[in-house]
Amino acid sequence: MLTKGDDYPIHQLPEPVASAGGERNFYDRYFFNGYAREGQAFFALALGVYPHRNVMDASFCVIHEGVQHNLRASRHLGVERMDTRVGPISVQVLEPLKSLRILVHENDYGIRADLTFLARAPALEEPRFQHSLGPRSLMDSTRLTQNGSYEGYFSVRGGRRVEVASEKWLGTRDRSWGIRPLGSMQESPSEPGSIPQFYWLWAPVNFDDCVTLYDINADAAGTAWHTHGVVAHLPDGQPETMQSVSSRVTYRPGTRHAQSAQILFVRPGGDELRLHIEPRYTFYMSGLGYLHPEWGHGMDRGEMALAYDTIDLATVDPAIPMYLHIQAVSRVRMGDRVGIGVLEQLVLGPHEPSGFSGLFDMAP
């Protein structure tokens, strides 16, 4: 069956683009976040395509005046993957790898947005994510990450329109595709007799003259099965991949969230760079479907579904499992540089270096 994508020279197999293949957990996904240099204003968008599940879903979230607003949409995919609209939420590629547009059209919940991402740095391909559990391949995906600025506006019900100017708003986007666990947690059981485990930190940071990227996935003993660090100098500097990277987290009591964190970069010549991360406020990734019991990624909500809820950031209980996965908007120091970025955190199950031995035990 032919679709619009077949008119582009992008084929990798002797099949039409719409062919869903046989992997139920294949996905293709956009992610964006944006944050003001000053204050506590934030937005995020995710849009995912799940061909074998016949689902496309999207979420747009805003933090405004201490409340996180979450707008979610889901529809049946059909065959046309290049129609990246889900209800009122859509993504447009204006210039590949340089500029993309987020739109949230009028809806019953009062959230609107028209935001354009403008690249500050080149899109960086991260090392391939590959992870197995026994004989099963849990993750096999490619991801690009790109830091940038934004211009446009967003608004929420009962709130004023917030103007977004590129000199005042920064953020990060990523694109990833491949295989990873989808749907509810019940669809991704752990090995018999074992406790589910996942340790993940991701820290894309914007400085005035450079950007940095860091991630780590580690097992229960703390051994990394994926980790990576890059510094890219602006505007046109060649990205420098670190020789080695490591991190250390101090947790807030009663949570699995960072009170502070340090990242160590060792450059190819042996010089060291240290990033000191000071979280300022928290975005809960459940707004984008992560760990959400009803709006998990790729879950079939029918022909078309739309939902909205809010999180009061002053009263939310971070020990509730749905709120484990976060992005902490943070002040970051690297030598004399001071920047801003996020520290994404998902610490599920045992992690010996952190002192966690159970599924949901918290820091003392």
Across the structure, where does each feature detected by a protein language model lie?
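Structured soluble/peripheral alpha/beta segments that form catalytic or ligand/cofactor-binding pockets
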Residues: 1-364
